[in-house]
Amino acid sequence: MSSAELGKLHIYASPEQWEKWSPRWKSIVFRTQYESIFKNPKHHGEKKPFHCLFKLAGTMKSISLSHLDIPEHRMSNAVAFPITTSTTPMQLDVTLQFRGHKIPLVVGEASVSLEDIFTHGTVESVIPLFMKKRHPEAYLRIKLVYTRSKRKSARKHKVPSSFHRFSGRRGLGIHYNHSGSQSSLITLPLPQKQPDFLRMNNDTNELKTNGFEPIRFVFTTTPYSPASFEVPKTLKT
């Protein structure tokens, strides 16, 4: 079953409370920094001697950290994890290592719960790092920022209207009947029957006008009827 991505978890970290670190690690860091000045004068002092490992749902990522409490380094040291529907358990494992001249040394470890990050969005705290002893070896500031992924709205299936169906071929959305003429029966009225103003008496062969004036014949009927422009046969000489 495929998992859907819900968002991303951004992690910012920096060493914190250097004065509360264990004397053992203080001496190791100071001795390493002091020796590097004489061995390599051009690059004296290791800028980022710590290596922080993050493990979430079987995925591990790392960032390099400085040993000084420099504020501008906090937001620059970032790593991101995708949060999906199958991301379990919701616990972040943190391991801090010191990169010496020979092999990396583990300073301490800790676990951070992610229950509050999905409701608050941003959580920042200082966590102690332990090794084997009960006393903390070092301190690390962790800032968690959770951003949700934008959901794509489902596109509704729109039924095209008659205008859109025929506008591609005709340009105006009018579907003509090819078997007839190009005149629309909707825009033009139907031919009207000629009014019976004249009546012929077959017995006396007399024409009764019933008040009809032939000179005003075409103006008394509708101008849209083609039959209104025809002269009656009875008036033709």
UniProtKB/Swiss-Prot annotation:
This is Uncharacterized protein C651.04. It comes from Schizosaccharomyces pombe (strain 972 / ATCC 24843).
